């Protein structure tokens, strides 16, 4: 019985010492920053909206692009004329070129180039055909390729559209 009490007392003492040791270690590792407090200033950035084809975009209820700070989100570009009518019906290669031409106009509005693009998402109703012409992108992205996804979809907003390309841009100031 004495031995059991002694062992129990030893365990209790060891536990107490380990807690004490942890507290001492924390006290030694804890430092107090005695420097002057700093003030954090939040910058409120107003979105800058851009419409490539205002009448069409108002009719469908979207903006082609919005810039907030150094980031620009560009809505999916499709092959259409200024009245919103599909162009190059049945010709995915030409539709893709038309998309990039429109995207370039938006980029230029914000003084950007395809070198500033960090994300490109492509939606197509004909992935095998898109893969045939995807090499055209090397003419667009001369220095590096952005991240992104290529997605095969059942349909786009208007049946004649075969491809839609959306971008995200980061412009260092």
For each of these PLM feature ranges, what is it?
Residues 1-32:
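Bacterial Sec-dependent N-terminal signal peptides
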Residues 20-98, 105-110, 115, 124-173:
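N-terminal presequence-like segments and the immediate start of the first folded domain
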Residues 118-120:
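Surface-exposed aromatic
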């Amino acid at each position: 019985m004495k031995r059991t009490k002694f062992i129990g007392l030893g365990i209790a003492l060891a536990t107490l010492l380990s807690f004490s040791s942890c507290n001492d270690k924390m006290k030694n590792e804890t430092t107090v920053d005695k420097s002057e407090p700093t003030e954090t200033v939040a910058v409120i950035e107003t979105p800058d909206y851009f419409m490539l084809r205002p009448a069409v975009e108002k009719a469908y209820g979207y903006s082609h692009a919005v810039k907030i700070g150094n980031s620009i989100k560009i809505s999916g570009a499709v092959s259409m004329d200024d009245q919103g009518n599909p162009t190059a019906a049945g010709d995915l290669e030409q539709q893709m070129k038309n998309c990039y031409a429109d995207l370039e106009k938006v980029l230029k509005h914000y003084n950007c180039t395809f070198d500033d693009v960090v994300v490109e998402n492509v939606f197509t109703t004909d992935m095998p055909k898109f893969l045939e012409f995807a090499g055209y992108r090397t003419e667009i992205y001369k220095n590096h390729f952005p991240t992104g996804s290529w997605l095969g979809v059942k349909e786009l907003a208007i049946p004649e559209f075969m491809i839609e390309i959306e971008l995200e841009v980061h412009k260092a100031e």
